[in-house]
Amino acid sequence: SLEIKQGDRICILGVNGSGKSTVIKLLLRFYDVDEGEILINSKNIKEYDVCNLRSVFSVVFQDYINYSFTLRDNIKITDLENAEWTDEDAIKALHIVDADNILKKLPEGLDTYIQKIFDRNGYEPSGGEQQKIALARAVNRRCKVMILDEPTAAIDPESECNLLNNLKHELYGKTLIFTSHRLSAVHLADKIVLLENGQVKEEGS
């Protein structure tokens, strides 16, 4: 069993196929558990409306998607109803995920299209840059619970260190659940869970 309290930062470690991504999909109710139960605030997860449940989480999946929109719209898409949202919010989100250099190199700044489409002069981000854009979108959503599946898998070690330190500061008091196979990401967590064959093998701080 595993207990996660409000404000915890949980790192789920394990080799490929150990069940890390499955834990995330169960929390988001992509499917339900066959045995046992998942409780949120002492209430069975199956009793929550799926849409309302998912609205609580800000999520970046391992197979994240960026859109053929401008950089601004790629970040803002998670916060479309916020009339007070400004470009500064996008710039702040990019800074938190150590992506200032992406913005600096874009020919039209936030108005630059991500991916080249039709007759527009877009920008083709690298794998690490794509991951940072997806992370910036999640940060912009500002949910109380953030779930990240292998959030730095495509990012170089130096940038990973900056990103993780920024996230640690930004997410203070919020709940963070993230998976990783890199030990370098462990310092972001205050609790570490080791999975093996879908079972909690070890747990500690």
Region spans (language model):
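ABC-type nucleotide-binding domain
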Residues: S1-S205
